[in-house]
């Protein structure tokens, strides 16, 4: 049973990340990396737009009605991006910038994209929390 739930959460997470990537590309972002991992953490999406690097954490949840996302605000997906997770993300961001940026640390931003998935209607709704301070 636990294995089944873990598999479903993995599918939900991957689908949410794919939807978030498509959303970003439609808005002019260029996806540079996905699931950039280091032993202390991971960043779901790394994209660029207007000479700025955007680090994005994606949180996906299943809902019964994408039109009424406000109903699901009791448990917000972004609540899972707690201070310890932000600390780990900060370490990964610094490592990425050291590793990939030839001109040193440039302009960057960190965002959380919440993807609300309705598997019955096969629809999704996206909400973005931009420019979170690391």
What are these regions (language model features)?
Residues 1-34:
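Acidic-basic catalytic patches of nuclease active cores, encompassing PD-(D/E)XK
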Residues 38-41:
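Short acidic/glycine-enriched loop/turn segments that link adjacent beta-strands
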Residues 114-134:
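Short, low-complexity, polybasic intrinsically disordered segments
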Residues 24, 43-67, 71, 89:
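Conserved catalytic cores of phosphodiester-cleaving nucleases, focusing on short active-site segments
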Residues 60-117:
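Catalytic cores of nucleic-acid endonucleases
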Residues 34-36, 105:
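Short beta-strand
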């Amino acid at each position: 049973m636990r294995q089944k739930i873990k598999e479903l959460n993995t599918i939900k997470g991957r689908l949410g990340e794919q939807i978030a990537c498509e959303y970003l590309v439609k808005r002019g972002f260029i996806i540079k990396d996905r699931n950039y991992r280091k032993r202390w953490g991971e960043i779901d999406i790394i994209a660029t737009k207007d000479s700025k690097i955007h680090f994005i954490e994606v949180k996906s949840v299943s809902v019964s009605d994408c039109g009424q996302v406000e109903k699901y605000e009791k448990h917000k997906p972004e609540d899972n991006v707690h201070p310890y997770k932000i600390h780990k993300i900060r370490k990964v961001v610094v490592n990425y910038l050291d590793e990939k940026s030839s001109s040193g640390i440039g302009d960057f931003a960190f965002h959380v994209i919440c993807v609300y998935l309705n598997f019955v209607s096969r629809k999704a709704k996206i909400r973005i929390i931009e420019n979170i301070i690391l």
